[in-house]
Amino acid sequence: MKVSATDSQNVTAGFILKDREENILVEKSLQLNKENNHLEGTICVDLESVRLWDNHNPYLYHAYVELKAEDGSLAEVIPYDIGFRRIEIIDKVVYLNGKRLVITGVNRHEWNARTGRCIGIEDMKADISCMLRNNINSVRTCHYPDQIPWYYMCDDAGIYVMAETNLESHGSFQKLGAIEPSCNVPGSIPQWRDAVLERAKNNFETFKNHTSILFWSLGNESYAGDDIEAMNVYFAEKKDGRLVHYESAYYNRAYEDTISDFETRMYAKPEDVEEYLNNSPKKPYILCEFMHDMGNSMGGLGSYMKLIDKYDMYHGGFIWDFIDQAIMVKDPVTGKDVLRYGGDFDDKPADYEFSANGIVFADRKEKPAMQEVRYYYGLYR
């Protein structure tokens, strides 16, 4: 544990670790000496045994960090629940706590049908409950950091998090469906580097203590260049035991060895996944987006899930997406609540129902597609 503080006097840092029954397992202290008005120190503890955190048993310990003034008076206490888990790649296969990791995930936008992107605690609780009920064990925070309480809920519930950095520049390298990166940003443009690194730093520093975060994602659909490579270096240098994810290096193979711990695709066909895994694969494989659930979709989920049993290096993926983005309004004729999408407000141009890709409606009622999700994801609980 590292303690960093700013104070005008020398202080003592204390660390207390308790189990759920409030039994004290560790109690240590460290004198922090002032240097240039900055206090810093590291407390190391050894535990003979711990209960490991995962989706099946999200066991959290109660940690307390204390700061005491020179006279012994208590200046500050920070309580924080922490878990113990290890994620690693061995022989190109990802393991969590020594067991092969299988992702049964979803991409999740923050959405409420009445308040838009301003969601509340009850929305988050409903989403956690829905995920657990339907065998969803992972969430990608597409394509930006979520509200802070969400990460605490994932810690408590055992939901694995791919914490995505707030970055997407889709239109700068894909034009009319074709890959054309001549105007790509951030690319390798020096003026953009500090901006994207600041976003990576914001993501890391805000959420670095959350047990549920297994992966840092560098962003979404922004091609690949020196700037995103620098983001990868930033997270790798933190050596926090997490893995780094980024999809769009697929389009620029010059960076395949320096960006992302995964081979990761979106909407690759099952045979495309197999083609990679059958031809000297370099990295473990996940689908950061698959099963685009627009309309009466989700029928092909089983063909992807079979790959989990066939290839150890295939680790599953994240369905696109969790919840429709639609707005609840009163129907002018019937007076009833109805959900409306792009184009329903005489807005042109519009993407029409393209915001309706969820496995739940915008009012959080489950769609029929959820039955398919519950069944196939349940096979890998």
PLM region descriptions:
Residues 1-153, 157-161, 199-200, 214-215, ...:
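Secreted/periplasmic carbohydrate-active enzymes, especially glycoside hydrolases
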Residues 104-109, 117, 164-204, 341-353:
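Aromatic- and acidic-residue-enriched carbohydrate-binding clefts of CAZyme catalytic domains
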Residues 104-106, 139-141, 161-163, 218, ...:
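Hydrophobic faces of well-ordered beta-strands that scaffold small-molecule active sites
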Residues 144, 166, 219-223, 240, ...:
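Catalytic metal-binding/acid-base residues of hydrolase active sites
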Residues 148, 170-172, 223-225, 252-254, ...:
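Generic structural signal for helix capping and beta-alpha/helix-loop junctions
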Residues 151-162, 173-187, 233-235, 263, ...:
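Aromatic- and acidic-residue-enriched segments that line the glycan-binding/catalytic groove
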Residues 156, 184-282:
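Active-site neighborhood of glycoside hydrolase catalytic domains
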Residues 197, 214-216, 230-233, 272-381:
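Substrate-binding clefts and catalytic carboxylate motifs of secreted carbohydrate-active enzymes
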